[in-house]
């Protein structure tokens, strides 16, 4: 399919779209024709994750270390883990999560290709050579960015605007995060576009899976989906996602949301982050989501975007191998000599020098501990490892200065010769050195005020498990080597929900953190062992391999419907999205239905009212004069039987449609029926006892009082609780609770409780819009005028009964042979209807077209 946008889906309603021959399975160095894909859009094969398939992992940085050669005379030699060019040495970055992810999948399981930037700037004249070396030796595709562009993209938009906002920092003043700068946003978009071009060079869209990582590349899914409508695309956000109240301050909020929704699967570390994302989609885009069989799905233009909630894990094998290194053992011995021999207990903090890590708050809590519990003075040491800051800016420098001054003040107050209560290590440490500190520390403190996953607690737990050699160094008795560990973790980090045995704290409450530190020191040994055992069991079974395999399995499942749907790209720029429809579900063409209308003589037309003829959210619900004129014109043709089918009361509908003499009306979902204005209303079902209202109404009143914006409508035979004007999230939550409550208290009553779009309704059993459709067809059959043309339009779950009756009647005697059947829903969504129109504007336009034809064939 040619990669282009369509602003009018009618152009493609017939399914005629250009196709091209299947691409060769071999991956080309550069795509021969940019933007042209294979005929996978017409390929119905299922998605199977086989050993021959590949994953293209895309991130801001490649898992590669690049070092300039001093002699510059490399011969291009290489090994399994290193490679040399004339000017550079390249090797794997063993600490990179992306490389650990590959190891977790297994060497033989699937081929992995990496796309990303190098940490070092490569001169222009060396880029082609470096590209070839990394592609051939490491299966890495480097993305070379000009320094100025990279600075504006990474240090500008990513670190000054997205990063603070995603960590709940609003730019209320120039000192509190960067104000929105559109030039930085343009740089961000440009870099994402460059990444898309790089992926195009190696992707085989028919088979490859693409997995994008983190907030640096949030608009990349749009560029890939625009090129290949059926690309198998996953995205994982490693940072927090803010609440809707924070996120909606972002000027490009909708662009980012729509870009992410071009993925098939979106992953988050915690339910809180996913919940915030779903809330933003609901409030800003009006999307709905549901949980089905354990999976959360967002309906977006006919596609289901799946939501994955699973925290990342650590690489167990790598950490265990580091624990076994002689260097680690020597370092552990040194630390025991320095602290253990002096009878001092080590508390450990390991954080980046970052404004969100809460280092200063941790130091203040240590100060509070020593003040409130002087018995710990001289006995407890807080070792704070401060990794170099990743970001730049005034706030980072101020935080560093505050950290140093706080450490100095506390050590001067509580220190003594040979004892400093706080040891600050701000020089870079090798990984084995950090692991040695984990092994010796009795408690690990993570007090970030906002963070993504944070794997420090996981590393600490596995390090405390140790091995036999370390047990000997620690002088653990052979018959009593039960391991123990203690964790004090912030409530605001991604790993907190997974660590049920940790002491959780609000890092802003310094007193509470100090109390938690004291509790961790006082916990009995057996309890420390139980907590450690519980944590180690979880961490060891939910490692990075488990995380990667689980994500890819869900990505495969999410892409399973690709081959069975027709896809069209619509929109321009970052508003681009793909409409995915079932093969039998298509947009209702004006030309098609008008042609059928002209060919036929007897017609049945059933129209829902709310959100079908009347736009959703309208304050004045009365039909417009234009709608009245259209209905009167259609009713003027003696071959037409036209019905409005609504949940409204008969009094309301009688008033609204009083100008329509020949219009049929079905009120309260079909309980009441009137063939035309001159005849009396009749009941479609036997008279019912409405004494159940005495039970249901007090329940609804309770929820109305507690849900601002909700109302109750008391009809003759039904009660409706509406939350159209309430907060969408709270209203939906209350509706679910109300539904359960009503079903419980009305279990023995002859009623059904239904939930529709922004309402919960209680009505008599057996009453449905399908009943009206069946009655209408029966009346025409009794008159001997079988309908040759049937049009049924609705937007709600209640209208599905009409669609089912209309579509199934083709096999019965109530419809003429070869009748033209048009069951049409509003919007692209799962439905029993075969057609759709986008909104009420298109519906009114369609009805106006039919009325114009009626004027031609039935003059006044």
UniProtKB/Swiss-Prot annotation:
Q: Which branch of life, at top level?
A: Eukaryota
Xref: CDD domains: GT20_TPS, HAD_TPP
Post-translational modification (record):
Phosphorylated.
- Spell out which residues are annotated as carrying Phosphoserine: 5
Region Glycosyltransferase, residue ranges: 53-557
Q: What is its EC number?
A: 2.4.1.15
Tissue specificity note: Expressed in seedlings, leaves, stems, flowers, siliques and roots.
Q: Spell out the InterPro entries in the cross-references.
A: Glyco_trans_20, HAD-like_sf, HAD-SF_hydro_IIB, HAD_sf, Trehalose_PPase
Q: Name one GO molecular function term.
A: alpha,alpha-trehalose-phosphate synthase (UDP-forming) activity
Q: Which UniProt keywords apply?
A: Glycosyltransferase, Phosphoprotein, Transferase
User: Cross-referenced Pfam families, in alphabetical order?
Assistant: Glyco_transf_20, Trehalose_PPase
Its recorded reaction(s) are:
D-glucose 6-phosphate + UDP-alpha-D-glucose = alpha,alpha-trehalose 6-phosphate + UDP + H(+)
**What is an annotated GO biological process for this record, any one?**
trehalose biosynthetic process
The text of the family note is: In the N-terminal section; belongs to the glycosyltransferase 20 family.
Subunit info? Answer: Binds to the phosphopeptide-binding site of GRF/14-3-3.
Instruction: State its role.
Output: Regulates plant architecture, shape of epidermal pavement cells and branching of trichomes.
Q: What is this protein called?
A: Alpha,alpha-trehalose-phosphate synthase [UDP-forming] 6
């Amino acid at each position: 399919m040619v990669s282009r946008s369509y602003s009018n889906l009618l152009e493609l309603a017939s399914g005629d779209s250009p196709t091209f021959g299947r691409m060769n399975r071999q991956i080309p160095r550069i795509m021969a024709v940019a933007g042209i894909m294979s005929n996978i859009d017409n390929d119905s094969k299922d998605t199977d994750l086989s050993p021959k398939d590949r994953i293209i992992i895309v991130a801001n940085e490649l898992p590669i270390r690049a070092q300039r050669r001093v002699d510059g005379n490399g011969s291009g030699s290489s090994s399994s883990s290193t490679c040399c060019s004339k000017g550079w040495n390249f090797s794997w970055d063993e600490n990179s999560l992306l490389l650990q992810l590959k190891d977790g999948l297994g060497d033989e399981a699937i081929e992995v290709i990496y796309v990303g930037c190098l940490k070092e700037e490569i001169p222009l004249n060396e880029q082609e050579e470096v590209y070839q070396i990394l592609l051939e030796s490491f299966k890495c595709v480097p993305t070379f960015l000009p320094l100025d562009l990279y600075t504006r993209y990474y240090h500008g938009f990513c670190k000054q605007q997205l990063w603070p906002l995603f960590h709940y920092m609003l730019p209320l003043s120039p000192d509190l995060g960067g104000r929105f700068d559109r030039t930085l946003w343009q740089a961000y978009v440009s870099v994402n576009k460059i990444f898309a071009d790089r992926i195009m060079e190696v992707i085989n869209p028919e088979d490859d899976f693409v997995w994008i990582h983190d907030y640096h590349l949030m608009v990349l899914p749009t560029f890939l989906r625009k090129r290949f409508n059926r690309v198998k695309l996953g995205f994982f956000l490693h940072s927090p996602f803010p609440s809707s109240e924070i996120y909606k301050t972002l000027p490009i909020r909708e662009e980012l949301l729509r870009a992410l929704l071009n993925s098939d699967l979106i992953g988050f570390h915690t339910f809180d982050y996913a919940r915030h994302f779903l809330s933003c989609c609901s409030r800003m885009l009006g999307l709905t989501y549901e949980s089905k069989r354990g999976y959360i799905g967002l309906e977006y233009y006919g596609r289901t975007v799946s939501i994955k909630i699973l925290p990342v894990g650590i690489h167990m094998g790598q950490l265990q191998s580091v624990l076994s290194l002689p260097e680690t053992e020597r370092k552990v011995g040194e630390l025991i000599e320095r602290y253990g021999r002096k009878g001092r207990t080590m508390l450990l903090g390991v954080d980046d020098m970052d404004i969100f890590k809460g280092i200063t708050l941790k130091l203040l809590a240590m100060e509070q501990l020593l003040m409130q519990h002087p018995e710990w003075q001289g006995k407890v040491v807080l070792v704070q490892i401060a990794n170099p800051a990743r970001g730049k800016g005034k706030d980072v420098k101020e935080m560093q200065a505050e950290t140093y001054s706080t450490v100095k003040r506390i050590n001067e107050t509580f220190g003594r010769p040979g004892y400093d209560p706080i040891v600050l290590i701000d020089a870079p440490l090798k990984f084995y050195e950090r692991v040695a500190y984990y092994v010796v520390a009795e408690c690990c403190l993570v007090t970030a005020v906002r963070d993504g996953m944070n794997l420090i607690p996981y590393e600490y737990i596995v390090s405390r498990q140790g091995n036999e050699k370390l047990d000997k160094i620690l002088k653990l008795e052979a018959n009593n080597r039960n391991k123990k560990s203690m964790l004090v973790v912030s409530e605001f980090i991604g790993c907190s929900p997974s660590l049920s045995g940790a002491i959780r704290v609000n890092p802003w409450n310094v007193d509470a953190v100090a109390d938690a530190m004291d509790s961790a020191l006082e916990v009995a040994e057996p309890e420390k062992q139980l907590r450690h055992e519980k944590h180690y069991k979880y961490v060891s079974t939910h490692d990075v391999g488990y995380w990667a395999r689980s994500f890819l399995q869900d990505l495969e499942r999410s892409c399973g419907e690709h081959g069975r749907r027709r896809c069209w790209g619509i929109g321009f720029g970052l508003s681009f999205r793909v409409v995915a429809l079932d093969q039998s579900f298509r947009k209702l063409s004006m030309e098609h239905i008008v042609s059928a209308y002209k060919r036929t003589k007897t017609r049945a037309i059933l129209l829902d009212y709310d959100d079908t003829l009347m736009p959703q959210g309208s304050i004045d619900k009365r039909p417009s004069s234009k709608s009245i004129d259209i209905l009167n014109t259609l009713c003027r043709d003696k071959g037409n039987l036209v019905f409005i089918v609504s949940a409204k009361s008969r009094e309301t509908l009688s008033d609204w449609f009083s100008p329509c003499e020949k219009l049929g009306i079905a009120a309260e979902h079909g309980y009441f029926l009137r063939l035309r204005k001159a005849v009396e209303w009749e009941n479609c079902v036997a008279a019912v006892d409405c004494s159940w209202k005495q039970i249901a109404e007090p329940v609804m009143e309770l929820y109305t009082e507690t849900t601002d914006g909700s109302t109750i409508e008391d009809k003759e035979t039904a009660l409706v609780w509406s939350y159209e004007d309430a907060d969408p999230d709270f209203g939906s939550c209350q509706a679910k609770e109300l539904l359960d409550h009503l079903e419980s208290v009305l279990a023995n009553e002859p009623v059904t409780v239904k939930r529709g779009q922004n309402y919960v309704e209680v009505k008599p059993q057996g009453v449905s819009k399908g009943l009206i459709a069946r009655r209408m067809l029966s009346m025409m059959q009794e008159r001997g005028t079988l309908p040759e043309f049937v049009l049924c339009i609705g937007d709600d779950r209640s209208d599905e009964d009409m669609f089912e009756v209309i579509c199934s009647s083709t096999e019965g005697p109530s419809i003429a042979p070869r009748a033209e059947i048009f069951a049409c829903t509003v919007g692209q969504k799962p439905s029993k209807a075969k057609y759709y129109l986008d909104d009420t504007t298109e519906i009114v336009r369609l009805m106006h077209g039919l009325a114009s034809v009626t004027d031609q064939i039935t003059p006044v």
